[in-house]
Amino acid sequence: MAAACGPGAAGYCLLLGLHLFLLTAGPALGWNDPDRMLLRDVKALTLHYDRYTTSRRLDPIPQLKCVGGTAGCDSYTPKVIQCQNKGWDGYDVQWECKTDLDIAYKFGKTVVSCEGYESSEDQYVLRGSCGLEYNLDYTELGLQKLKESGKQHGFASFSDYYYKWSSADSCNMSGLITIVVLLGIAFVVYKLFLSDGQYSPPPYSEYPPFSHRYQRFTNSAGPPPPGFKSEFTGPQNTGHGATSGFGSAFTGQQGYENSGPGFWTGLGTGGILGYLFGSNRAATPFSDSWYYPSYPPSYPGTWNRAYSPLHGGSGSYSVCSNSDTKTRTASGYGGTRRR
């Protein structure tokens, strides 16, 4: 080597040494790693709500993550979003992200987040490490539907709307209020249907007062079951010849007893309560949605794999869906952030 690199071959020896250095140092520095990509060369990203990014230096993150907006993150969850590289603005890559959204929602602020290969300032990123963070806002139509929903569903919509915008502490208080309301409803139902209330006799009757007692205590069918009002057991045959003689008195007494809160009052009350506490419980009745935990399981030897979240995690949903839901292609625009 020394003999070959004479005074006239100094340039050749320098190139040969540089070549040997690149052959040995390149793989060590990851220059030939197929997972190391120049971000500007990435043309498109297809991201899924139930998958995680790859990782090398940091922990993996969800490929799709809602971070806020006027509609909140629980009202609607897009399943797949595709982002296209729209060019370089002199600072970083700019993206256009599209998906099918309910006509009540639109994208707010969006940003593509990728893991730098060596650091957060590296122009090269790890393949598969990019995810999208987005805000979900209401459209004008969505705001109109929200207002109409509040007018139509009354107390249920108001309570759910309050729950949606309140903090976690206030949610606990609203849950306590709900329990108190349900207990009150149970008490009303008990008083209407199950409690055998005592009613005073009518102010005037042309028959002797003992006729009512005779009808009630000489009935061959016996007294009503414990816990139920006697007037709900219906007319009962006495099994005696006095039936014809005291029939009008029995009818008058029964008519008086049924004049209080009875079957039709309970039926109307049940219908109103069923309407208020039925299926229309959400403040944003547009669609169902679920999302998964924001942190994947950690397993050794899986640094460069895309994770899928475990099922059974915390979720949020809206039970009030619209069968006439319409969708359209929505777009969001934003830049890049390296982590």
Curated annotation (Swiss-Prot):
Signal peptide: 1-30
Compositional bias segments (type: Polar residues): 318-330
Organism: Homo sapiens (Human)
Annotated domain remarks: The cytoplasmic C-terminal region mediates interaction with STIM1, while the N-terminal lumenal region mediates regulation of SOCE activity.
Family to which the UniProt record says this protein belongs: Belongs to the SARAF family.
Subunit structure: Interacts with STIM1; the interaction is inhibited by the interaction of STIM1 with EFHB.
Main localisation: endoplasmic reticulum
Lumenal side: 31-173
UniProt tissue specificity: Highly expressed in macrophages.
GO biological process: calcium ion transport; regulation of store-operated calcium entry
Keywords assigned: Calcium, Calcium transport, Endoplasmic reticulum, Ion transport, Membrane, Signal, Transmembrane, Transmembrane helix, Transport
Protein name in the entry: Store-operated calcium entry-associated regulatory factor
Cytoplasmic side: 195-339
Residue ranges of the TM segments: 174-194
